Amino acid sequence: MAEFVRAQIFGTTFEITSRYTDLQPVGMGAFGLVCSAKDQLTGQPVAVKKIMKPFSTPVLSKRTYRELKLLKHLRHENIISLSDIFISPLEDIYFVTELLGTDLHRLLTSRPLEKQFIQYFLYQILRGLKYVHSAGVVHRDLKPSNILINENCDLKICDFGLARIQDPQMTGYVSTRYYRAPEIMLTWQKYDVEVDIWSAACIFAEMLEGKPLFPGKDHVNQFSIITELLGTPPDDVIRGICSENTLRFVKSLPKRERQPLANKFKNADPDAIDLLERMLVFDSKKRIRAGEALAHEYLAPYHDPTDEPEAQEKFDWSFNDADLPVDTWKIMMYSEILDFHNIEQANEGEVLVEGAGTAPQGFA
């Protein structure tokens, strides 16, 4: 039986195994608090995420189960990896992952990025998305604060709590507004992996400009700002709008022409503009896919088709439509945690090679 110790962090009780020491708060989300810690077993710094009251409602239980299953399944250099998971005596759940020094949001607010860093970060984002999408998963909440970076410029996508199956009938209103694809705002359904490409494009533009591309005050303003740059949506996109209210709103907007992105990004490389044009497309079916984007000329310094893997198998979403009581989710969670530890013991000594390509020099 593991020995647990308690610590108070921002008024929140962290109840963790004695394997982890030197807790320091690093971030707070809607569903959990994240602390850095030292892993006494490996000597390495780690991030410990406490999931608040995971068994308080069936919805929270299912969300936690989904994130756990995804973190177990997704094994890729550009995706955050799970190193430990446990349930405390107080029945909180703790995810332990590798610790990266910063995130892209903090980086963007502290300094302008040079071209080679923008290329390398975008390359790694798309490399991770190619893998995730091949597993049948859509992240749905890609934004700079969910992109972690270390001092070697290794980049990892995190926070899969909102991720969903690839499904032409997806519903919901999920990602942070600035990075949200127009099809989510327009239809509230029928969206797929392309929503992540739109988010990646918004992040790419923010790296180029140093500020958000579409900083909408609300979803109406957000959509209006998008049309100022990209013009009025094409007729086939408008025909796909399901909500009468949304349809009336879109038709009420003045007709606008798409503006050349080169006019907005005056200092950007022409290849960067070309890739951005292919990512920022209203019609999601015409938006470039992650694998295609990796082969674009702008990313040529890092592109290696032999080192951009896809998932070996699709993620099992069979639980996703289940409407189960908390106790059932809890049993399923215990089973997954037990399975994780059995797999970890079997795989001891197996190490992922860190970092894709060769990082640019001079980043600190």
From Swiss-Prot:
InterPro entries: Kinase-like_dom_sf (IPR011009), MAP_kinase (IPR050117), MAP_kinase_CS (IPR003527), MAPK_p38-like (IPR008352), MAPK_Sty1/Hog1 (IPR038783), Prot_kinase_dom (IPR000719), Protein_kinase_ATP_BS (IPR017441), Ser/Thr_kinase_AS (IPR008271). It holds the Pfam family Pkinase. GO terms for cellular component: cytoplasm; nucleus. SUPFAM superfamilies: Protein kinase-like (PK-like). It catalyses: L-seryl-[protein] + ATP = O-phospho-L-seryl-[protein] + ADP + H(+); L-threonyl-[protein] + ATP = O-phospho-L-threonyl-[protein] + ADP + H(+). Residues 20-299 form the Protein kinase domain. It is an enzyme of class 2 (transferase). It comes from the Eukaryota. The active site is at D141 (proton acceptor). GO terms for molecular function: ATP binding; MAP kinase activity; protein serine kinase activity. Dually phosphorylated on Thr-171 and Tyr-173, which activates the enzyme. GO terms for biological process: stress-activated MAPK cascade. Keywords: Activator, ATP-binding, Cytoplasm, Kinase, Nucleotide-binding, Nucleus, Phosphoprotein, Serine/threonine-protein kinase, Transcription, Transcription regulation, Transferase. This is Mitogen-activated protein kinase hog1. The gene is hog1.
